[in-house]
């Protein structure tokens, strides 16, 4: 199982939100580059970055920070948030990003998504964020009428190889992942799944590993120290 320490960017800082609420923001580190270096130092093999400002604005607003992170670490970095054109995708790749995560565009601009997948194949990940089972977009501010399962099936037909699935109600809560929704997703599509939201303990990670989930994104648990990064990396390596 792959472990993805998370860095959420807002106004150039590393923050955490609670259940996706921008008003419930906690600054975890004023210097996201330093945070990325810390994660790498403790053994992280890859990083997950979300441009929260970009997710709302529809364009990357923390590109300079992302570029500095990519230059500061030697591990692969995947980035999501506000990526809604091929130009935006190419710009991120040009500054050193390894993979990009498309969310809103996956629902509302299938032509762009198909072009991106055709050009960059496994480098394109789709992020599916669900609120009560329905897909949320534009920084989780809007909720659509399409279920997360239906969107995942559409993504599979297009050729998407990896999905990041987030249950928004779990995000930032340390309440444990939504195992039921993940199990249903696993039964519905044959795509690699990265679980996000609510992971609070080594036991949570072990449960997801036992389910053969490809990867897990860990945010608040690392910052609050309910999960030790070195320990979880060792545990998943042995599984």
Curated annotation (Swiss-Prot):
GO CC aspect terms: cytoplasm
Keywords for the protein's UniProt record, in alphabetical order: Amino-acid biosynthesis, Cytoplasm, Histidine biosynthesis, Isomerase
A Gene Ontology BP annotation from the UniProt entry: L-tryptophan biosynthetic process
Keyword Lipid metabolism listed: no
Cell location: Cytoplasm
Pfam families: His_biosynth
Pathway stated in the Swiss-Prot or TrEMBL entry: Amino-acid biosynthesis; L-histidine biosynthesis; L-histidine from 5-phospho-alpha-D-ribose 1-diphosphate: step 4/9
Enzyme Commission identifier(s): 5.3.1.16
UniProt-recorded Gene Ontology molecular function terms: 1-(5-phosphoribosyl)-5-[(5-phosphoribosylamino)methylideneamino]imidazole-4-carboxamide isomerase activity
Xref: SUPFAM superfamilies: Ribulose-phoshate binding barrel
Record: active site: 8 (proton acceptor), 129 (proton donor)
Catalyzed reactions per annotation: 1-(5-phospho-beta-D-ribosyl)-5-[(5-phospho-beta-D-ribosylamino)methylideneamino]imidazole-4-carboxamide = 5-[(5-phospho-1-deoxy-D-ribulos-1-ylimino)methylamino]-1-(5-phospho-beta-D-ribosyl)imidazole-4-carboxamide
Main location: cytoplasm
Record has Cytoplasm as a keyword: yes
NCBIfam families: 1-(5-phosphoribosyl)-5-[(5-phosphoribosylamino)methylideneamino]imidazole-4-carboxamide isomerase (TIGR00007)
HAMAP family, per the entry: HisA
PANTHER family assigned to the protein according to its UniProt record, in alphabetical order: 1-(5-PHOSPHORIBOSYL)-5-[(5-PHOSPHORIBOSYLAMINO)METHYLIDENEAMINO] IMIDAZOLE-4-CARBOXAMIDE ISOMERASE
Protein family membership: Belongs to the HisA/HisF family.
Protein name: 1-(5-phosphoribosyl)-5-[(5-phosphoribosylamino)methylideneamino] imidazole-4-carboxamide isomerase
UniProt organism field: Bacillus cereus (strain AH820)
């Amino acid at each position: 199982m792959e472990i993805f320490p998370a860095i959420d960017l807002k106004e150039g800082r590393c923050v955490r939100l609670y259940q996706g609420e921008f008003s419930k923001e906690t600054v975890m580190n004023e210097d996201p580059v330093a945070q990325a270096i810390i994660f790498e130092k403790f053994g992280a093999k890859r990083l997950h970055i979300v441009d929260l400002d970009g997710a709302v604005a529809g364009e990357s607003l923390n590109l300079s920070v992302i570029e500095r992170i990519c230059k500061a670490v030697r591990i692969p970095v995947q980035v999501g948030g506000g990526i809604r054109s091929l130009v935006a995708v190419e710009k991120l790749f040009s500054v050193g990003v390894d993979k990009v995560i498309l969310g809103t565009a996956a629902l509302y601009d299938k032509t762009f998504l198909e072009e991106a997948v055709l050009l960059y194949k496994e480098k394109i990940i789709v992020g599916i964020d669900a609120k009560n089972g329905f897909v949320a977009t534009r920084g989780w501010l809007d909720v659509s009428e399409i279920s997360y399962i239906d969107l995942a099936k559409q993504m599979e037909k297009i050729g998407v190889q990896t999905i990041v699935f987030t249950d928004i109600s779990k995000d930032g809560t340390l309440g444990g992942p939504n195992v039921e929704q993940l199990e249903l997703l696993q039964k519905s599509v044959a795509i690699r799944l990265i679980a996000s939201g609510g992971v609070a303990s080594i036991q949570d990670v072990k449960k997801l590993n036992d389910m053969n989930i490809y990867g897990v994104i860990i945010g608040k648990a690392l910052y609050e120290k309910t999960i030790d990064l070195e320990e979880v990396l060792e545990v998943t390596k042995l599984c």
